[in-house]
Design a protein with these regions (language model features):
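Generic structural signal for small/hydrophobic residues in well-ordered secondary structure
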Residues: 28-31, 53, 81, 128, ...
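Core AdoMet radical
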Residues: 121-131, 142-169, 181-200, 210-229, ...
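A short acidic/small-residue loop/turn micro-motif
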Residues: 16, 40-43, 144
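C-terminal accessory region of radical SAM enzymes
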Residues: 1-8, 38-85
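Recognition helices and adjacent regulatory flanks at domain boundaries
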Residues: 88-122, 132-134
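Short Cys/His-rich "knuckle" micro-motifs
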Residues: 88-92, 140, 147-149
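Local cysteine-cluster metal-coordination motifs and their immediate loop/turn environment
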Residues: 20, 35-38, 74-86, 131-141
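A C-terminal junction/extension of Radical SAM enzymes
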Residues: 1-33, 102-112, 117
Length: 249
């Protein structure tokens, strides 16, 4: 599809525009919501234990980001991408504009204050929980349940529980995300450890049921467990057309 000059300029020449706030939201296992996984962790755009994904979608922080981007203003959440670009690297902003630029037409629906009513998540990076079977030194209790006992022994009682969920409870986030599955283009699985999470296999089952085999699957996994009960991840991967795995070995 041919793009208008202004659309092409946004995707390739703008120093601040990014497709992410129109297609995506990222959630920590503790419920904090961010535009993406590289966003400044000091500036969450909401909390999914207090509000739904849909409510955060058009709450003031996310609306302000969209408005700033369309006005070619910088966003405090995006400093990591700006820094990478200043050093000559390809940033997540750059790659997102390339990978999701096919959606640039929806940006025209954005209201003057940054409100965007076309609530369809095309890219998931929701850390359903912190469930993990390892306690890697580069991690901690927020992203690995296996760290909790060690942290408690070292520092005393923790301010957060051993097991955490992105939503208000184990089922909440899954229930909110199901309606977006038909629109998915990409899913990033991390955790916790995604290959031992029930939600991971539920999502793959649903993608398979809807025959969405062109959805790009990207993994950050310790690769120590390849199955959950009777479900083996290799049986799923062979059915999808684009699977990328980052494995800790």
């Amino acid at each position: 599809k041919d793009l208008r000059t202004d659309q092409l300029d946004r995707l390739t020449k703008s120093k601040t525009f990014c497709m992410i706030p129109w297609i995506h939201m990222h959630a920590f296992p503790n419920g904090q919501a961010f535009p993406c996984c590289l966003a400044d962790s000091h500036h969450p755009i909401g909390h999914l234990h207090k509000n739904t994904v849909k409510e955060v979608w058009n709450d003031t922080p996310y609306k302000t980001m969209r408005k700033n981007m369309l006005e070619e203003k910088s966003c405090k959440e995006c400093t990591k991408c700006y820094e990478q670009e200043d050093m000559g690297f390809v940033s997540m902003r750059n790659s997102s504009n390339k990978n999701f630029g096919n959606n640039i037409g929806i940006v025209d629906q954005t209201l003057e204050d940054g409100t965007f009513e076309d609530f369809k998540l095309r890219y998931y990076d929701i850390r359903f929980s912190n469930l993990c079977n390892m306690s890697c030194r580069t991690c901690g209790g927020w992203f690995s349940s296996s760290w909790h006992d060690e942290e408690t022994a070292l520092y005393g009682k923790r301010e957060y529980p051993k097991f955490m969920f992105a939503g208000k409870d184990k089922e909440d986030m899954w229930n909110q995300l199901q309606e977006h599955i038909p629109y998915l283009e990409q899913v990033y699985f991390a955790g916790g450890e995604p290959l031992i999470m029930e939600e991971h296999y539920r999502l793959l089952d649903e993608l398979e049921r809807q025959e969405l085999f062109d959805v790009r699957l990207i993994y950050n996994t310790n690769f120590s467990k390849l199955k959950l009960k009777t479900k083996h991840v290799f049986d799923y991967w062979q059915r999808f057309n684009n699977v990328s795995v980052g494995a800790s070995l």
